[in-house]
């Protein structure tokens, strides 16, 4: 059974008015066809739906669609653009915590990429975007290196910078 069959059974057996669908996953995959040059360069598009299928789903089920975008946890972006990733000075490579790779939240290139993907998703028909992992790695590892010194003030500045772009 595919995911849509499971979702259909939920619709039949419950009263659902909202659905959250991944747009950009914690693996870094974008789940719709996009012309975004960075997504194409990273070969991370895994098309699961398109504008027509979303419109059909919304209209047939009278749904409010929320698109989930994983923001700064992105192994594909971090590996393809290590200069934009959190760096581990002890291992002299990009930082990984339990297999999770993080983009440096101060990276304008990464911020713009995520915003561009999110805007494109809105054009597909999503009513709202839910940003997830809009944070720094939760480790206090002394070997993590960011472009900006990792102070409380810089962390707030960088997260707010992203949020300002998202408005």
Question: Which sequence ranges carry the predicted segments?
Answer:
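Aromatic- and acidic-residue-enriched segments that line the glycan-binding/catalytic groove
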Residues: 31-42, 74-96, 139-150
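Catalytic domains of carbohydrate-active enzymes, especially glycoside hydrolases
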Residues: 3-29, 122-129
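Glycine-rich, aromatic-flanked loop segments that form ligand/cofactor-binding clefts
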Residues: 18-23, 46-94, 130
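Active-site-adjacent "subsite" loops/lids of carbohydrate-active enzymes
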Residues: 1, 72-123
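Solvent-exposed loop/turn segments at secondary-structure junctions
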Residues: 24-29, 71-75, 135-138
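The substrate-binding groove and active-site-proximal loops of carbohydrate-active enzymes
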Residues: 1, 35-48, 98-112, 149-156
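Aromatic- and glycine-enriched glycan-recognition loops and surfaces
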Residues: 2-13, 40-61, 154-161
């Amino acid at each position: 059974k595919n995911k849509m069959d499971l979702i259909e059974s939920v619709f039949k057996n419950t009263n659902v008015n909202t659905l959250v669908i991944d747009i950009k996953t914690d693996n870094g995959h974008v789940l719709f066809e996009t012309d975004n040059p960075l997504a194409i360069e990273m070969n991370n598009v895994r098309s699961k739906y398109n504008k027509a299928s979303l419109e059909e789903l919304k209209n047939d089920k009278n749904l409010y669609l929320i698109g989930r975008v994983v923001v700064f946890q992105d192994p594909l972006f971090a590996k393809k653009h290590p200069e934009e990733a959190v760096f581990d000075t002890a291992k002299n490579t990009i930082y990984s915590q339990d297999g999770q790779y993080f983009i440096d939240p101060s990276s304008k290139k990464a911020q713009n990429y995520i915003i561009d993907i999110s805007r494109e998703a809105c054009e597909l028909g999503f009513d709202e975007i839910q940003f997830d992992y809009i944070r720094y790695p939760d480790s206090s590892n002394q070997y993590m290196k960011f472009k900006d010194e990792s102070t409380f003030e810089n962390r707030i500045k960088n997260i707010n910078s992203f949020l300002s772009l998202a408005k």
